[in-house]
Amino acid sequence: MSKTKDYVRPRTRLYLIMPPRIEDVEGFAALLETALSAGDVACLQLRLKTDTGEIDAEATRAVGAAITEMAQAYGAAVLINDSPDLAVELGADGVHVGLEDMSVKQAREIVGPDM
């Protein structure tokens, strides 16, 4: 695209990917709120894993419950990694489904047409 003097570059927004483990949920939530208030965050991806690399459902529930509404209040979409059922349960905005996870069709069947 050629730039003209009337060209307005779209603003850059941030995509935050959470660390694979969060030990201090309250401390992390406070830190995340600082980040959300400091910059324009488009979305954040919650991707908590176990030692074997599987999704840590218990930790995802705990952290997701602590941060989802707060992030959404700042205008950030919340994506849950690899788990459409947890995305629905937590009221997330979407789910990240990797190539080696379920198909998009399977994920859509779980989250429904409105997510």
Annotate each PLM feature:
Residues M1-H96, I110-M115:
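Conserved N-terminal beta1-alpha1 strand-loop-helix module at the mouth
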Residues L99-K105:
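Flexible, gly/pro- and Lys/Arg-enriched active-site loops
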